[in-house]
Regions:
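Conserved, structured C-terminal
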Residues: 2-179
Length: 179
């Protein structure tokens, strides 16, 4: 998420991107601070997610593009609301910005979701797989490249900009993936 011109959040889940970002910053001599924010994500997923989340924050949430977000506040609870999720049905992730208000946010969401049948749950692998979303370590890891995943359409090796791994990806494209 790009919160400001000079502030980005990466949702790292169980990946090594935090270490990667630190290594890039050190190797390039960048004047940046890389830290893990005190933020707690809460996902509202499924066919009624939009109704639940809009009943809390308002209809503007329907205008969010997929993977876009907006900062908001509800009952004094600071959050970032993102249109995203691990299901084909879509949903939202609400990033709590003040951990001391976690219980309040939980109760607020559960109350708003009650008329819609909202229940606590967990990530569902089949929903993720049906939605075509990969999970780091389960489906891919640091040794997996986009060509092995069938993501050729997402790789533009003709662009003028240089990026880390461009030469390696050119070689893989030319020789074909090993697996």
């Amino acid at each position: 998420l790009k919160l400001r011109e000079d502030l980005f959040w990466f949702s790292i889940a169980d990946s090594d991107i935090w270490f990667w970002a630190r290594a890039i910053a050190a190797e390039r001599g960048l004047d940046v601070k890389i830290s893990e924010p005190d933020v707690s994500p809460l996902a509202v997923q499924g066919p009624k997610a939009g109704a639940v989340v809009s009943s809390i924050f308002g209809d503007w949430v329907h205008d969010l593009k997929y993977f876009w977000f907006a900062e908001s506040e509800i009952n004094g609870i600071p959050v970032a609301v993102q249109r995203s999720g691990w299901s084909k049905q879509g949903g939202f992730e609400i990033y709590l910005r003040d951990g001391s208000k976690g219980d309040q946010l939980w109760e607020l969401i559960m109350a708003a979701g009650a008329p819609h049948g909202l229940k606590p749950g967990h990530t569902s692998s089949i929903r993720r797989i049906e939605g075509g979303m990969l999970s780091y370590h389960a489906d891919a890891d640091i040794d997996t490249n986009p060509f092995e995943l069938g993501f050729d359409r997402l790789v533009n090796l003709d662009m003028d900009a240089e990026f880390i791994g461009k030469a390696a990806l050119r070689k893989i494209k030319q020789e074909g993936p090993m697996r």
